[in-house]
Regions:
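Internal nucleotide-binding/catalytic subdomain
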Residues: 173-288
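ATP-binding N-terminal substructure of ATP-dependent carboxylate-amine bond-forming enzymes
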Residues: 5-110
């Protein structure tokens, strides 16, 4: 156990990597632990340290896309545990660098984090392992993508599809298309995403139904499901407008037991098993 021997109340320092409401919530959970004395959130934000019962520090002298800058923060505060929560930091290999430098870091490695940071790899992983997924094609050419959607809409004029950036796009990378004009426009928008997130993009079948997600915590071999959630993915009510991050969620989601069992067996169990068989054990929180 990572706090084995830490029998004193208020003993540990925890570093949380991230800067938004997620990290605020995570820091509040650590604050309730009798084992935690001090919490550092990097880069954090001004509100995170407000009105706290324990010492909560924010340190903005780092970039989430620069693992070395986060390592410097870790060396400064010498935390007992580092919780790497943010997508960009995981995708950049922050956990790998921290672990190689002797720190106890919670989160997936850069290779395992591709299940979120590289949508092309993620869909191919699902296909290899028989995990249910929408039909998809990926492209690195705007022209090829446009030719494909022209052919698709010539056969299915009212098809719902999503044009999706393969890389990390702050929750904004999936663009809904209900006709050819929208699809062509959304393919053109792929070049607007920073850091080349849309250099490779997917054209995916749109699925109709109730959307929700499950959280599982895994050590790379075993796992436990502990939460479900239904998040608001679009800017406006009633699923209108572009997708974005930070619009809030409801937890737990209203899911019947048979569906929950199916999610466990067909999605989470299969994903943990498959990623382990590919020698990329996933440790941390898996959100499917």
């Amino acid at each position: 156990c990572w706090f084995q021997g830490a029998n004193m109340v208020e003993h540990l320092t925890v570093l949380i990597v991230g800067c938004v409401a997620r990290e605020h919530t995570i820091s509040s959970a650590y604050e309730r632990s009798p084992h935690v004395k001090r919490i550092v959130v990097a880069p954090g934000n001004d509100f995170i340290a407000y009105g706290r019962q324990k010492e909560v520090i924010t340190d903005g002298n780092c970039s989430l896309k620069d693992p070395m800058s986060i390592l410097e923060i870790a060396r400064k505060y010498e935390p007992d545990l580092i919780d790497v929560a943010q997508d960009d930091a995981l995708g950049a290999g922050t956990v790998d660098l921290l672990q190689e430098s002797g720190f106890l870091a919670f989160g997936p490695t850069q290779a395992a984090a591709r299940i979120e940071s590289n949508k092309r790899w993620s869909r191919e992983f699902m296909k290899r392992n028989g995990i249910p997924h929408p039909n998809f094609r990926y492209f690195d050419s705007e022209k090829d993508g446009i030719n494909y959607v022209k052919e698709l809409y010539s056969r299915y004029p009212h098809r719902l599809i999503y044009v999706k950036a393969s890389g990390l796009a702050a929750g904004k990378g999936a663009l809904r298309s209900e006709n050819l004009e929208q699809a062509i426009r959304n393919i053109g928008r792929m070049r607007e995403f920073p850091d080349g997130a849309g250099d490779v993009f997917l054209v995916e079948e749109g699925l109709i139904g109730e959307e929700f997600s499950y959280y599982a915590i895994s050590d790379g071999a075993t796992y436990r499901i502990f939460k479900s959630a239904q998040d608001s993915k679009t800017v406006f009510n009633f699923d209108e407008g572009d997708q974005t991050g930070g619009m809030g969620s409801v937890s737990p989601a209203m899911v019947t037991s048979p569906i929950a069992e199916e999610i466990d067996s067909k999605l989470i169990k299969t994903a943990i098993k498959g990623i382990g068989e590919e020698k990329l054990p996933y440790t941390g929180i898996l959100y499917l």
